[in-house]
A protein has these predicted regions:
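Glycine-rich, charged/polar anion/phosphate-binding loops
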Residues: 16-19, 25-28, 46-49, 101-103, ...
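A short glycine/serine-rich beta->alpha loop
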Residues: 81-85, 118-127
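Glycine-rich, flexible beta-strand/loop modules in the N-terminal catalytic cores of phosphate-handling
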Residues: 22, 30-109, 199-221
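Short amphipathic alpha-helical face segments that pack within enzyme cores
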Residues: 95, 130-138
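A structural signal for small-residue-enriched, beta-sheet-centric alpha/beta enzyme cores
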Residues: 87, 108-111, 126-130, 140-144, ...
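Alpha-helix C-terminal capping segments
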Residues: 33-35, 137-141
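Short, Gly/Pro- and small/polar-rich lid/capping loops
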Residues: 1-33
Length: 244
């Protein structure tokens, strides 16, 4: 296995740090740094649900995603200036919401909505995966707070969830692509998994050559190893924030 342009082994994540409680005014929050990618994730609770869910005794979790104008090399116009979110933004925020909902016990959540907001401060590849991984920590901290305030009888989580990118670069399967790798990859994939190894979503796109089944299996194995490490980072951040 050859080293990558930044010296990492093919199965190595970028340095990943999650700082819990980054936004004091949020019910739960975290700043996640994955290499040079940085995303602020917040969770806010509202004591109501969408109209179509009212009276069912179930809660809801939804997500929004955005990038600061200077988060990339070229200034990105704000969605509010454009008048609507672009297609990529809509796709990513739906992915974040689906991913987090995969580990929620909606009955235990009760008739309340948790809003997850993921704002990219700096983008160097993997922003959607970093958003999912950080949003889970923000959510877990928000639920701990609600339980501590007596608003929840128990934590309505069925497990943890994290996400990581992987792909084929120069014919080699690699984990956690940064921007230079992502922009030149023959195959680009995003994998969302629970801490127990259950797949929530797999997105894989072959850019120039078809993806073989052998390479797909290799990518999933890489992702599983990466997500196992990310789960440890998540658990450490939650433990730090909830320690007496």
């Amino acid at each position: 296995m050859s080293a990558r342009h930044d010296g990492r082994a093919p199965d190595a994540l970028r340095p990943t740090v999650i700082e819990p409680g980054f936004v004091r005014t949020a019910t739960g929050s975290a700043l996640i740094s994955v290499g040079e990618t940085r995303v602020i994730c917040t969770a806010s609770a509202q004591e109501s649900v969408p109209r179509w869910m009212a009276g069912k005794g179930r809660g809801w979790v939804t997500a929004e995603y955005g990038m600061l104008p200077a988060s990339t090399g070229d200034r990105k116009q704000r969605d509010v200036t454009r008048g609507r979110p672009d297609g990529r933004t809509v796709e990513i925020q739906r992915l974040i919401g689906r991913s987090i909902r995969g580990v929620i016990d909606f009955e235990a959540l009760g008739e309340r909505t948790i809003y997850l907001d993921c704002d990219v401060l700096q983008a160097d590849g993997g922003t959607r995966c970093a958003s999912i991984t950080g949003a889970y920590v923000a959510l877990a901290l928000a639920l701990e707070r609600l339980a501590g305030e007596g608003r929840l009888e128990r934590i309505p989580l069925n497990g943890s969830v994290a996400a990581v990118s992987c792909g084929i670069v120069d014919g080699q399967a690699v984990l956690d692509l940064d921007y230079p790798e992502d922009s030149s990859a023959e195959v680009d994939a995003n994998v969302v998994m629970t801490g127990e190894g259950g797949l929530i979503e797999v997105q894989a796109t072959a850019e120039r050559t078809p993806l073989s089944r052998a390479h797909l299996d290799e990518l999933l194995a890489l992702a599983a190893g990466g997500i196992d490490h990310l789960r440890g980072v998540q658990q450490a951040a939650i433990a730090l924030a909830t320690a007496p």
